[in-house]
Amino acid sequence: MRHGIVLFTCDRGITPARAAKAAEERGFDAFYVPEHTHVPVKREAAHPRTGTGTLPDDRYKRTLDPWVSLATAAAATSRIRLSTAVALPAESDPVTLAKTIATLDHLSGGRVTVGAGFGWNTDELADHGVPAGKRRTVLREYVEAMRALWTQDEAAYDGQFVKFGPCWAFPKPVQTHLPLIIGAGGGPQTFAWIARHADGWMTTPGEQDISGKAAALRQAWAAAGRHGIPDIRVLVAAKPSPGDLAAWAAAGATELLWGLPDAPAEAVEAYLDRLAGRIAIR
């Protein structure tokens, strides 16, 4: 299994560039950052971890832009993959976002993986004009439209939420296919969506025993006529035992995502030293 690092970016603590550089130097395979454009003060949507409107971490209100963060990380590194856990594409203009991601892939030498979510904070999405009951449809259209812009010399798209006429959009990504991983609670609807439109699944923190869900995803994958196997990335929520690591590997996990502490830069680097030693990647 590969090992990635997740930095909950905010306006304090270690910078994305320094964290990505430290992760790369210690042998980690990928660097992830999240996205929230803003958090409405009054919300109806419950947070998945608290079950209420209470946020479990004040960094939700202070999150840095993910693509700017990854651009600084790209400039400080040469090997580590650059990703999001997760981005919310529906909160951006799709043509502009396609340009941003293609540019990042171009300038980083083809190191981008898009981790995307449907969005639990429906109040946040509503401020961007996304109807709560149409989140999956909107994301599908964004993905289809951006892939057209990334792969076609003259791209056009005509959907319910995304429309643009024939246009030129360069640069194209270095990668002929930009990987798309969906971070969402595992279930039949999500797995069917992934099997049709994405390359893999990223678990939520509450999903640690994934054996049954991984099998269900592979069944949906085969039913959709997909070849190979889906990418499965586990967001590690606590300090796992060797048995947990073995169980994830047996279930088909391809990558484990380890969160960084909300701490000063030196403390984060010391944590990375300990983590790299514990999982024996150095």
Residue ranges and their predicted role:
Residues 1-282:
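Active-site-adjacent structural elements that line small-molecule/cofactor binding pockets in enzymes
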